[in-house]
Amino acid sequence: MNIENSLKELGLSNHNIGTSTGSNYFSDGEKISSYSPVDGKEIGTVSTTTFEDYNKVIESAQSAFKFWRTVPAPQRGEIVRQFGNKLRDLKEPLGVLVSYEMGKSFQEGLGEVQEMIDICDFAVGLSRQ
């Protein structure tokens, strides 16, 4: 799998919004470019966060925390399990992106994604204690 196909499968484009609350996206900040150390090519651009948008994200996160802490641990664990499954589904394109963006081998990129999957599995186990 090449980087172009991986970016497409991950839903990434030439320009991406860098700030989100999960339901709201903010793109008013300046754009910065990400370059691959592999070949020096631009991978894409991302919008930075303005001070005002940052405050909105923090407020949203604080509000979400107040709700999230009331959700029973097994239900939270189920959501984390779904995250882990999505990471499993996208392991190869994520591994390609990590390797290209960080200048790592493909196997190292896959290893980085596997670590995220393992953390999700660990958290699911904790939710059942």
Language-model-derived ranges and their functions:
Residues 1-45, 78, 82:
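Terminal low-complexity tails and localization/encapsulation signals of metabolic enzymes
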Residues 43-129:
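Glycine-rich loop-to-alpha-helix module at the N-terminal edge of alpha/beta enzyme cores
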